[in-house]
Each structure stands twice: as structure tokens, then as C-alpha cells.
Amino acid sequence: MSDVQTPFQLLVDIDQRCRRLAAGLPAQQEAVQSWSGIGFRMGGRFFVAPMGEVGEVLHEPRYTQLPGVKTWVKGVANVRGRLLPIMDLCGFLGTELSPLRKQRRVLVVEHLDVFAGLIVDEVFGMQHFPVDTFSEQLPPLEAALQPFIHGVFHREQPWLVFSPHALAQHQGFLDVAV
């Protein structure tokens, strides 16, 4: 007698042959979680601000100086119809701004009632760090800088996590009058 298979038995046979001859899947690589922010430099230090805390990055705009304000308040600029106060972040923190104007950029911060532009020496764009390189153990910092640093990522050099929102809530930053 001939071996007659039912359609179901035929499908089971095909399934078994396919499973025997199928190549295995490639090994799964575990995805490394990363943290992203806007990298910038002030003096010889590297900083990174959380993505949600910087609205945009601008070239240093022309601004009008204001009387009766602290020296780190550079003035006010018209940016697309909005008046943007321009602040020298290095000056606020007690350091010198780089003399190389071409590299300077302005980080625009809008948080609660504060809308301000922070001049920094240089911006490096988006930076990505593996989360396991983060540490809350900070290197020695100036007292003026400490309230705004929330940790450090380690790469070739340390990248300090700078919070523009913490700066925007700091009374010393809000008090601009002489």
C-alpha cells in the first residue's frame, strides 16, 4: 500500500523539515542605554545640559546694552520679535569669557518666567553618554558653580551636567540690578 498523508500530516512534516534546516538567529546584542544633552565649553571645562533645558542654540546676536545692571548682563537682543536678555555665563560664574567671538554661542533657556540667552565659549552640539558613565561624585568645583552641577559623565575628560533650569531659579541670577 502506498503511504498517503493527510494534508495536516503533510504540513507537520514540512514544519519539522523547516525547523531542522533553518539557520539560527544572530546573537542579540544588549542595547546600551544612553543619555543625551547639549555639550558646551566654558574656559577649560566641558559641560552638558539636559536636552529639555535648552530651547535653542544661537550665534551671538547683536544686543543693546542696558544701564544699571551687573557686568555679566550684556544686554537685550531682538530674536524673531522677542526680547532676549543676553547673559555672560562665564562672567556670572566669576571666570573670563573666551576672546574668540566666532566660537561663542548663546544657549536659550525658557523656564517658568525666565527667558534668557547664556553666552558660552563654544557649543559642541548633541552629546551622547552611556548611562553607566554617570557619577554624582563631582570633581572639586568653585562654589559659584556647585548649585548648577548635578553630576558628571566620564569620557576622555569629565563632562559636568549643568542645569540651566537650576540657574534660572537661582536668586543670584535673577538679581541683575546693580
Swiss-Prot record:
Q: Where is the signal peptide?
A: none
Q: Which Gene3D superfamilies match?
A: CheA-289, Domain 4, SH3 Domains
* Keyword field: Sensory transduction
Q: Where is the CheW-like domain?
A: 34-173
Q: Which GO terms describe its cellular component?
A: cytosol
**Entry's Gene Ontology BP terms:** chemotaxis; signal transduction
Xref: SMART domains: CheW (SM00260)
Q: Which domain of life is it from?
A: Bacteria
- Mind telling me which PANTHER family this protein's record contains? CHEMOTAXIS SENSOR HISTIDINE KINASE-RELATED, PROTEIN PILI
Q: What does this protein do?
A: May be a part of a signal-transduction system that regulates twitching motility by controlling pilus function (extension and retraction).
Q: What protein name does the entry list? A: Protein PilI
Per the UniProt entry, what species is this protein from, by scientific name?
Pseudomonas aeruginosa (strain ATCC 15692 / DSM 22644 / CIP 104116 / JCM 14847 / LMG 12228 / 1C / PRS 101 / PAO1)
